[in-house]
Amino acid sequence: MHPIAAGAFSEGPNERSVLYHFLVAESETPDERAARRHHAGRSAGESYAATLEQMNPGVAITRVAPADAEAAVLPPHAIARYDAVFVTGSPLHVYDDTPEVRRQLAFMRAVYASRTPAFGSCAGLQLAVVAAGGRVRKMPERIEAGIARRITATDAGRDHPLLAGRAAAWDAPAIHGDEVEDLPAGAILLAGNAVTCIQAAEIRHDGGIFWGVQYHPELSPGEIAVALRRQADDLVAAGLAHDAAGVERRAALLDALHDAPDDRALLWELGVDRQFADEAHRRIEIANFIATLVAPHRRAA
C-alpha cells in the first residue's frame, strides 16, 4: 500500500503574486473524507490539490466542501475570484435526493453562473451533468474498476483540446459504479469506451464551461490500489474478482507499478502502456484544461 502523507495547502484570497488561484471542491461528506484519510492519507480534495500543486508550483489552492451542512454558500461572484474550479470524485450518488447532493448541485450551478472554467473527475463530471440538466444512473453492470480500458475519442473529441496528446485509444485510472446516462442539451461527447459510453465531455451552461472525465487523471496507480482494497467486497459482489485475494493481487500490481512505472513486465501483466504508467501522460487532460481555458485568461488579466 502507498499511504500518502498529508501536505500543506494554500488557503485564502487572490493575490497577484501567485501563478493561479484554484478552488478545489470536495465531493465527499465529512465521514467519507475521514475514511479516505484513514486508508489513503488524504481526502479526495487534498489529493487533487497535491496533484495541482505538483503540476503548477506556486499555485494557491482553496478547498471547500459544498456537501457539508455548515459549509459557507459561495455565490457566483465569490467563485469568480478564482482562475478555475476543480470538482473531485466521491462515493456520492448524484441521483439520490439528499441534502448533501442538493447542496453540491447548488454549488455547481453557482460555478456555471460564475463563468469560471471548471474541470471534474468521476463524480465531478456527474455533478456537472445533473446541474446542467442531464442524467446519471447506477451502472447496469459494474465492470470498470482499477483501469478504464480502450477509451476512444469521438469525432468531436479527436480535435478537441481536452484530449490533445492522447493516442487513438488509451487506458486510465478509474473506479465508479455510476455513469452519465444523458448529457445536458448542447453538451459535446468527447470520448467513451465499451463499458461507459460517456467518458469525457464538454458542457456549456448558464454562461459557464466545464470539461470533465469519468476516469481519474489526478490519481496515481498507488491511490487506485488503495481504492480497490477499500471496495474489495463490492468488487467481489460485482463479479470482478473471485475473492478478496484476487482484488489484493490486482492492487499489489498497481502498487508495484506506482514504484516502478518503467517496469516492462508490470506493464505487460497489467495490460497497459506508458500512457497509463507515465505521470505526465496520465494527467494530460488536467494539463490541457489549464493550458487552454485557464492560462490565456490569467495572462490577459
Protein language model features and the residues they cover:
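Structural motif
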Residues: 15, 77, 120, 181-182, ...
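Short catalytic/ligand-binding loop motif for oxyanion handling, primarily in non-cytosolic enzymes
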Residues: 31-32, 93-95, 127-130, 199, ...
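Short, glycine/charged-enriched secondary-structure capping and boundary segments
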Residues: 37-39, 99-102, 132-136, 187-188, ...
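Cysteine-nucleophile active-site neighborhood
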Residues: 82, 90-155
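Hydrophobic/aromatic beta-strand patches that form the interior of the parallel beta-sheet core
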Residues: 23-25, 62-64, 86, 119, ...
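Pocket-forming structural segment of enzyme catalytic cores
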Residues: 134-227
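N-terminal beta1-alpha1 cap of cysteine-dependent amidohydrolase-like domains
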Residues: 1-100, 105, 110, 114, ...
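A hydrophobic, small-residue-rich beta->alpha segment in the mid-to-C-terminal subdomain
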Residues: 219-253
